[in-house]
Design a protein with these regions (language model features):
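A short, flexible loop at the N-terminus of ABC-type nucleotide-binding domains that lies
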Residues: 4-9, 17-28
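Helix-to-loop junction immediately C-terminal to a conserved catalytic motif
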Residues: 57
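Conserved ABC ATPase "signature" region
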Residues: 124-142
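Conserved ABC ATPase signature
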Residues: 146-150, 154
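Catalytic Walker B motif of ABC-type/P-loop ATPase nucleotide-binding domains
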Residues: 171-174
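H-loop/switch region of ABC-family ATPase nucleotide-binding domains
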Residues: 206-207
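Conserved beta-strand-loop-alpha-helix hinge in the C-terminal portion
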Residues: 226-248
Length: 256
């Protein structure tokens, strides 16, 4: 198992987030993520998992409480600063639940190149990064295809390629196996395992208990009131059938 450093990657203190005209989707959330951890955010649909990941990804900020990344507080002013934003998104990669949201270029090659060019890398470096990542993910045959014509599994691989080409320290995945066939799910699980062994910090979300112990060492459980009710080793948490039933993650038929 990968050892964790004492370096704090993300820290939320008493964070609250509310979308317009709605009840809070995050209530008084305090949570710390250490470098090298593999953490899964667990909870029923609508509990606030995706919103939390978007805060970690620098796409949203809590309206109350504080959020720090890499031991520095993150503010709206900082995120609106171009140099800060570029540096942040070089360190933190986000894979949306729906790959179509982040695929918008005319070819797979252009899709992978986009973020690298935004970072100011020269064309030779970009080409080298693209070659390396398509070989790593075994998608060389897709390089000239249009992303919108790909299958769901292929789109997920291209979305991963566009993020991993940036070589982020932190990889965040929202419902990573959603819509994937069993073979692609296993491929993704093995990939996340190897990235974790390489020292990446990996944060994911799911409501799939068959998946969580395979992609995380630590699980953070939300209830339907949008609060954290448990934060402990994954294998211990998924043994707590009564708690999982109480948060509507499993039904009465669930057996440990």
């Amino acid at each position: 198992m990968t050892t964790h450093s004492n370096k704090t990657i993300f820290q939320l203190d008493h964070a609250v987030f509310t979308y317009p005209y709605e009840e809070p989707v995050l209530r008084n959330i305090s949570l710390t993520i250490q470098e090298g951890e593999k953490v899964c955010i667990l909870g029923a649909n609508g509990c606030g998992k995706s919103t939390l990941l978007k805060i970690f990804s620098g796409l949203l900020l809590p309206q109350q409480g504080t959020f720090a990344a890499f031991e520095n507080e993150v503010t709206e002013k900082k995120l609106n600063d171009d140099s800060f934003s570029k540096a942040y998104h070089k360190k933190v990669g986000f894979i949306f639940q729906d790959s179509d949201v982040q695929l918008f270029c005319s070819t797979v090659e252009e899709e992978i190149a986009f973020g690298l060019l935004q970072q100011g890398l020269n064309r030779d470096t970009v080409t080298r990064r693209i070659d390396d990542i398509v070989k790593m993910l075994e998608i060389e045959h897709l390089i000239n295809k249009a992303p919108f014509k790909l299958s769901g599994g292929e789109k997920k691989k291209v979305a991963l390629a566009s993020v991993l080409a940036m070589n982020p320290d932190v990889l965040i995945l929202d419902e990573p196996t959603n819509g994937l066939d069993p073979r692609t799910q296993m491929w993704l699980i093995r990939l996340l395992d190897s990235l974790g062994e390489a020292g990446k910090t990996i944060i994911s979300s799911t409501h799939n208990l068959d998946l969580v112990s395979r992609i995380s060492d630590r699980a953070v459980l939300f209830d339907e009131d949008h609060s954290i009710v448990a934060d402990e080793p994954t294998r211990a948490l998924i043994q707590n059938a009564e708690l999982l039933k109480a948060v509507n993650l499993v039904d009465e038929s669930y057996r440990v």
